[in-house]
């Protein structure tokens, strides 16, 4: 899943949310040696969300459909669709988390941006490199529109020529076409399961009792 979904699938805890956001920046397990519980849970939650998404039968089916147009970039396309449809269906999905049940999406994004800004010295890897642009250009709100994910896909393709098919795919996409509807069906079916599974992961985590939830 992409950045917005990772933030929404996090518990309402600043450090866990920040480390989930930047989880891609941590490889292996050596970083865990002296890590605080919140860091361990956040990074491991990030990995859980990604693996749960990648291995879910509904995701595999959706990626197979998108692969016809997006090629090997189908998993990235699905991630971008996830944030777009989370915007589109926020009023339906916000109740999946008690802390967003009555919160407009722009207020949720602003709160997350404030938390990340306060802890941006903790960011690693891709999130660290992208954060200044994400903040200044308000990327997460830009995903509200199909034109926003088209811009994101085009920018990614420009920076990384190996994923050029991603930009071509999204620039040829129209709301309501076959690929759009396949991704929409995937999101509506899958996302509630992801939030539920992420919540259970946090509740069952061995370090849950070591963390202050106040």
Annotate each PLM feature.
Residues 1-214:
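N-terminal leader/auxiliary helical segments
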